[in-house]
Amino acid sequence: MSFPDITPDLKAAMPALRGRLLANESLAPLTWFRVGGPAQVLFTPADADDLAYFLKHLPAELPVYVIGVGSNMIVRDGGVPGVVIRLAPRAFGEVKAEGDIITAGTAARDKRVAEVAASADLAGLEFLFGIPGTIGGALRMNAGANGGETKDILVEATAIDRRGETHRLSNADMKFTYRASGTDAALIFTAVRFRGTPSEPAAIRARMAEVQAHRETAQPIREKTGGSTFKNPPGHSAWKLVDAAGCRGLKVGGAQVSEMHCNFLINTGNATADDIETLGETVRERVKASSGIELQWEIKRIGVKAS
């Protein structure tokens, strides 16, 4: 499927734009599942000012989606109408430590932020070492693992709205809840400030090693996967509910529930986005029938299904 090419009109309306605009660009290579259709427009801004300029001049009726490394996302096979914005590490990936504060661009990998904090002898960010996404995604979904969450360390986030205006949000402004933030969904996060706690370097490194060992032994990290598929319902572990419903190893087309960790869906090699989403919905139905609990997707799904 392809969409009408609107990039010439956008370029004409934004003569000072410095970032890259591409029409009908495949998004599959930009996601961990390696599935999905094209973006009608894929925009990679040169920096935060370029992003603000783009948003200020973008027609309000065009939907906007943001992707990082595509680690917790399904792009549907029909592609994504509107604009997909990809914040590249070269422009939004800097990470530095000053005192007990870690400043990072939102395209920085979570693991990299944990490493910089450890190098500065700052504890509290070790949990990020086990999350395979970017800081932007961590902010949007209050990412967490191994007993830590983004809300525990956030001092301030910087974001740009659809009008191209910059906002600075405190921890309270983010309205964090379990695997979510209550901020305007249209805000695009560009930078963050985290606070760590000075600690013994050996203890920090030991904790990071524990996080990595857990991932290696309990999660299918070498598969094409999107990470944790469903949120844990209050008082329950999603994987246990999936397992109890008999879904471990369940397949739909080229998609499969991981045998190693059944809250992970994997692309065994030839899956479509529809295979993966259908498998997820099948699991939800079986868990509801088995336990009465309705699992909620943690993975973000964007775009339209193939016609």
From Swiss-Prot:
<comment type="pathway">
    <text>Cell wall biogenesis; peptidoglycan biosynthesis.</text>
</comment>
<dbReference type="Pfam" id="PF01565">
    <property type="entry name" value="FAD_binding_4"/>
</dbReference>
<feature type="active site">
    <location>
        <position position="298"/>
    </location>
</feature>
<dbReference type="InterPro" id="IPR006094">
    <property type="entry name" value="Oxid_FAD_bind_N"/>
</dbReference>
<dbReference type="GO" id="GO:0071949">
    <property type="term" value="F:FAD binding"/>
</dbReference>
<dbReference type="InterPro" id="IPR016167">
    <property type="entry name" value="FAD-bd_PCMH_sub1"/>
</dbReference>
<dbReference type="GO" id="GO:0009252">
    <property type="term" value="P:peptidoglycan biosynthetic process"/>
</dbReference>
<keyword id="KW-0131">Cell cycle</keyword>
<dbReference type="InterPro" id="IPR036318">
    <property type="entry name" value="FAD-bd_PCMH-like_sf"/>
</dbReference>
<dbReference type="InterPro" id="IPR016166">
    <property type="entry name" value="FAD-bd_PCMH"/>
</dbReference>
<keyword id="KW-0963">Cytoplasm</keyword>
<dbReference type="Pfam" id="PF02873">
    <property type="entry name" value="MurB_C"/>
</dbReference>
<keyword id="KW-0274">FAD</keyword>
<feature type="domain" description="FAD-binding PCMH-type">
    <location>
        <begin position="34"/>
        <end position="199"/>
    </location>
</feature>
<feature type="active site">
    <location>
        <position position="179"/>
    </location>
</feature>
<keyword id="KW-0573">Peptidoglycan synthesis</keyword>
<protein>
    <recommendedName>
        <fullName>UDP-N-acetylenolpyruvoylglucosamine reductase</fullName>
        <ecNumber>1.3.1.98</ecNumber>
    </recommendedName>
</protein>
<dbReference type="InterPro" id="IPR016169">
    <property type="entry name" value="FAD-bd_PCMH_sub2"/>
</dbReference>
<dbReference type="InterPro" id="IPR003170">
    <property type="entry name" value="MurB"/>
</dbReference>
<keyword id="KW-0961">Cell wall biogenesis/degradation</keyword>
<dbReference type="GO" id="GO:0005829">
    <property type="term" value="C:cytosol"/>
</dbReference>
<keyword id="KW-0132">Cell division</keyword>
<keyword id="KW-0521">NADP</keyword>
<feature type="active site" description="Proton donor">
    <location>
        <position position="228"/>
    </location>
</feature>
<comment type="function">
    <text>Cell wall formation.</text>
</comment>
<dbReference type="GO" id="GO:0051301">
    <property type="term" value="P:cell division"/>
</dbReference>
<keyword id="KW-0560">Oxidoreductase</keyword>
<keyword id="KW-0285">Flavoprotein</keyword>
<dbReference type="InterPro" id="IPR036635">
    <property type="entry name" value="MurB_C_sf"/>
</dbReference>
<dbReference type="GO" id="GO:0071555">
    <property type="term" value="P:cell wall organization"/>
</dbReference>
<comment type="similarity">
    <text>Belongs to the MurB family.</text>
</comment>
<dbReference type="InterPro" id="IPR011601">
    <property type="entry name" value="MurB_C"/>
</dbReference>
<dbReference type="GO" id="GO:0008762">
    <property type="term" value="F:UDP-N-acetylmuramate dehydrogenase activity"/>
</dbReference>
<keyword id="KW-0133">Cell shape</keyword>
<dbReference type="GO" id="GO:0008360">
    <property type="term" value="P:regulation of cell shape"/>
</dbReference>
